[in-house]
Structures are given as C-alpha cells and as structure tokens.
Amino acid sequence: MKVGFIGLGIMGKPMSMNLLKAGNELVVFDFNETAVAEVVAAGAKGVKSGAEVAAECDTIITMVPNSPHVRAACLGEGGIAETAKPGTVVIDMSSIDPVESKKIGAELAEKGIELMDAPVSGGEPKAIDGTLSVMVGGKKETFDKYYELLMQMAGSVVYVGELGSGNVAKLANQVIVALNIAAVSEALTLAKKAGTDPELVYQAIRGGLAGSTVLDAKAPMMMDHNFKPGFRIELHIKDLNNALNAAHAISSPAPLTAEMMEIMQFL
C-alpha cells in the first residue's frame, strides 16, 4: 500500500520503519531533515510538506505532538487539505484533545477527507518492535479497511467507537499509567527506606492484585537506577491536561489526575 507519513519523531520514525519493513511504499515529511533522511535511507520517499504527501497518497498517517500540530498538518498552510483528493483518509495517531479531533474531522469532511483518530500506547520500545496498542475512533468500515495496516505497527488494534473515541481511550490510558508509575515509585521507596529489599518486595507483590504491566516494566528500571527517558514528561503533562479538560467539559471528577499533573509540573 502507498502510505503518507507525517511526523517522524520518537514514535513516528520507528512506526514508519515498521511500515517499510512490511512492504509498504512510504512518502514521508517532517521538519527534522535528519529524521527524514534516516527513513529515506530505509526506502521511503521524502518530500517538503504535508501538501506534497497528500498529492501522492490517499492514505496518510499523522504522528505529531499535540492538537495544534494536527490542525496545522491537516488544515494549515502547506497541509494535507491543500492537495488531498476527495476520499483521502487521514489516520491521526497523535494523542490529542478528543473535542479538537472531532472539530478537525468535521472541517476535513467538508473537503471530502475522512479522519480517524488512532492514538497509541507503549512508548518508544513498543514503537520500535511493532507491538503498540492502538485505540481507534471513526467509521467502523474504515477501521475494518485499515486494520491490517495498523497491525503492522501494533500488537493490538481495538475499535472504540466514533471519531474522538480513540483519544478518549488514550486519555484514560495516560491517567492510569501516570498514577501507576507514581504509585510504583512511592511503594519501592517505602520498601527501601524501611530496610526491606525492593527486589524481593517486587517479586512478592507482582503476582497479586498490585501486579500490572507498569509494575513489570518500570520497577526493574527503578531498582537498576535506569532513568533513561522513553517519553518526554511535557507530553505526558499535555495528555493529563487534555484529560482534565475533557473531564471538566462533561463534569467528570478527576482529582487524582489534577494532583498527578501538579507533581509532574513540579518535576
């Protein structure tokens, strides 16, 4: 399949590489020319704008930091809408505000362009090995059409509902992950300061109700003092802020999310 890919950052670059490995023809764009050069060296074609991507592809993936970047990539100067043919499908795999996702989708629809939101979870390691979790919102028939393409970057791809639902699921994911990481850190610190071996505590609790993917992924790193970042904290703050905005819009209480965002901002 010929696919456009806009956004070759920490997540987008390995995701695009996996699409190439699966045999797709890729046309890519990013403002970071070094990232573009790396993907081009792997077999993609590099172009100078989103509009140039859309001129060649009727299936386009976007993977950019936040809502304004998605809007710019889709509807801004030099963006997808400038040259996209009616019937073009944009699969936005960024993590953005679900309300804004719906607005962008409505504006694209006026131009005959369909939007799906398909944010991912798993971080850079799972982007590299192609085992991301993808949560998708949009038309079910479009999801069915692109399921196999998405699976080339993922370990699981789940249809959640109408446009915007994918980002609602991602916000729920980010709330749980942030609070879980904080809880693991606090618990292991408690064990160490109490004079108990954190490794033995980890082994004791991981098979019980406290066991989780986050515990198994993060506890060993914490105990090894491996704090190499796999995700920028400002992006997680962005996700929590989007979660709070979404919660406030529907009067859903989110006190733990608010507290967690304050802690992250302090860091």
Explain the meaning of each model-derived region.
Residues D129-G137, V158, E162-A194, Q203-A217, ...:
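Active-site-proximal catalytic alpha-helix in oxidoreductases
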Residues L163, N167, G211-L267:
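Interdomain hinge/lid region at the active-site interface
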Residues L26, G46, E114-M116, V157, ...:
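Hydrophobic beta-strand scaffold residues
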Residues L8, I96-Q174, A178:
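Rossmann-fold dinucleotide-binding core
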Residues M1-M63, T88, M93:
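NAD(P)+-binding Rossmann beta1-loop-alpha1 motif at the extreme N-terminus of oxidoreductases
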Residues E52-A54, T59-I60, S67-L132:
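Rossmann-like NAD(P)(H) cofactor-binding subdomain of soluble oxidoreductases
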